[in-house]
């Protein structure tokens, strides 16, 4: 017997964050997709509207990878941890620097992401 959409949503609502993370990884592997790529694509238009509000006080920040530095493998690992991207997507992002890693973040989260990437050896900017 197939589960209804409501039953699936109820099951997901009862999961912990760790269980949800594992479920997403399994779904990405099974269906050959990346949930993070869709989230970045959805967040990009929202960040465009933030330019008008920047004249006031900036509340959303973008972490931009300027350069991978000498330890590219560590930077790729850090990008994967921060974004949830797959290995190929994270490598492409690092190879294509300068590129935004995360967008529309609160200042504290942006600074934490910057610190993590810098510890891995990358040159990073918060805009």
UniProtKB/Swiss-Prot annotation:
Any one of the GO BP annotations: translation
One Pfam entry name: Ribosomal_L12_N
An example Gene Ontology molecular-function term: structural constituent of ribosome
Keywords of the record: Ribonucleoprotein, Ribosomal protein
Example of a GO cellular component annotation carried by this entry: cytosolic large ribosomal subunit
Family recorded in the similarity comment: Belongs to the bacterial ribosomal protein bL12 family.
Assembly mode: Homodimer. Part of the ribosomal stalk of the 50S ribosomal subunit. Forms a multimeric L10(L12)X complex, where L10 forms an elongated spine to which 2 to 4 L12 dimers bind in a sequential fashion. Binds GTP-bound translation factors.
Entry function: Forms part of the ribosomal stalk which helps the ribosome interact with GTP-bound translation factors. Is thus essential for accurate translation.
Protein name: Large ribosomal subunit protein bL12
Taxonomic lineage: Bacteria, Pseudomonadati, Pseudomonadota, Betaproteobacteria, Burkholderiales
Recorded name of the encoding gene: rplL
């Amino acid at each position: 017997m197939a589960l209804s959409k409501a039953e699936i949503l109820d099951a997901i609502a009862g999961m912990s964050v760790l269980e949800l993370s594992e479920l997403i990884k399994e779904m990405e592997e099974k269906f050959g997709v990346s949930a993070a790529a869709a989230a970045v694509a959805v967040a990009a238009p929202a960040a465009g509207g933030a330019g008008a509000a920047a004249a006031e006080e900036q509340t959303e920040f973008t972490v931009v990878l300027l350069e991978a530095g000498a330890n590219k493998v560590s930077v790729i690992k850090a990008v994967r941890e921060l974004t949830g991207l797959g290995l190929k997507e994270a490598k492409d992002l690092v190879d294509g620097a300068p590129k935004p890693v995360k967008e529309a973040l609160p200042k504290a989260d942006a600074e934490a992401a910057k610190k993590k990437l810098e510890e891995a050896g990358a040159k990073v900017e918060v805009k």
